[in-house]
């Protein structure tokens, strides 16, 4: 049974002087991701799971200006697994008018439930988007090997790190009109590619997860590097796999 919080206890969940507290981290990371061009125009998002509590950035806001009091807090143990349009259980809802939970919520839950991830990041990286356009339209996944930055990526996003000569494979799914409608496609791709550390969304961006926020961030950075180098390799007719 999920713990019951008083209003005071719920409010205290987003106020801490600890810079490593999830509510503070989400704000800091969103600012850093904004500088990288990953969450501009209110796009993208991040969620951190700490024990049985999930911290969630709001949707449709200036990500570089998020404050801890804007963070939504949900119990991981929901009455039902979040799905498009489903009702959510909340521990804390921000008092500021106009704030809504992230549209990425059910997709973050895919990472939490299917990979037991501790954090999930969604970016609108231009490198991710361009890569999905440069690859053949019917390509089910992105594959690359013999790149040093592969060593910063983990099997399934949460397992052992890949080796230089191993092949990284990231599935690609088609975009939908509404973010939440990606939930089923993402889950299906995660089931088909259990070793994938992320999901690319054609003409949209990428979802990346990890055991911890540190691992999710590191892998998002490594993957973005690999997406960028892959775009340049394709444009210069250099094979993505092998050491030739």
Swiss-Prot record:
Name of a matching Pfam family: Aldolase_II
Biological process, per Gene Ontology: L-methionine salvage from methylthioadenosine
Enzyme class: lyase
InterPro entries given in the database record: Aldolase_II/adducin_N, Aldolase_II/adducin_N_sf, MethylthioRu-1-P_deHdtase_MtnB, Salvage_MtnB_euk
Cofactor: Zn(2+)
Residue positions binding Zn(2+): 122, 124, 204
Active site: 148
Domain of life of the source: Eukaryota
Cellular component terms per the entry's GO annotation: cytoplasm
Entry's EC annotation: 4.2.1.109
Gene Ontology molecular function, alphabetical: methylthioribulose 1-phosphate dehydratase activity; zinc ion binding
Signal sequence interval, chain numbering: none
Similarity comment: family membership: Belongs to the aldolase class II family. MtnB subfamily.
Name of the protein in its database record: Methylthioribulose-1-phosphate dehydratase
Lineage, top ranks: Eukaryota, Fungi, Dikarya, Basidiomycota, Agaricomycotina
Originating gene: MDE1
């Amino acid at each position: 049974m999920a713990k019951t919080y008083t209003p005071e206890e719920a409010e205290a969940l987003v106020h801490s002087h600890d810079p490593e507290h999830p509510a503070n981290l989400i704000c800091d990371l969103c600012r850093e991701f904004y500088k990288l061009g990953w969450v501009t125009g209110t796009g993208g998002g991040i969620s951190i799971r700490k024990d049985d509590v999930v911290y969630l950035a709001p949707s449709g806001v200036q990500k570089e200006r998020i404050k801890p009091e804007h963070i939504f807090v949900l119990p991981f143990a929901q009455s039902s697994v979040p799905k498009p349009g489903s009702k959510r259980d909340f521990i804390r809802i921000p008092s500021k008018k106009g704030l809504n939970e992230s549209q990425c919520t059910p997709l973050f839950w895919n990472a939490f439930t299917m990979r037991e991830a501790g954090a999930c990041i969604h970016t609108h990286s231009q490198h991710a988007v361009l890569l999905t356009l440069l690859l053949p339209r019917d390509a089910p996944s992105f594959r690359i090997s013999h790149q040093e930055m592969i060593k910063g990526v983990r099997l399934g996003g949460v397992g052992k790190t890949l080796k230089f000569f191993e092949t990284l494979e990231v599935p690609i799914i088609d975009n939908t009109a509404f973010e939440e409608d990606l939930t089923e496609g993402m889950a299906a791709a995660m089931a088909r590619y259990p070793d994938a550390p992320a999901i690319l969304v054609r003409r949209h961006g990428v979802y990346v997860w990890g055991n911890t926020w540190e691992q999710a961030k590191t892998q998002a950075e490594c993957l973005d590097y690999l997406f960028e180098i892959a775009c340049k390799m394709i444009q210069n007719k250099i094979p993505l796999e092998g050491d030739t």
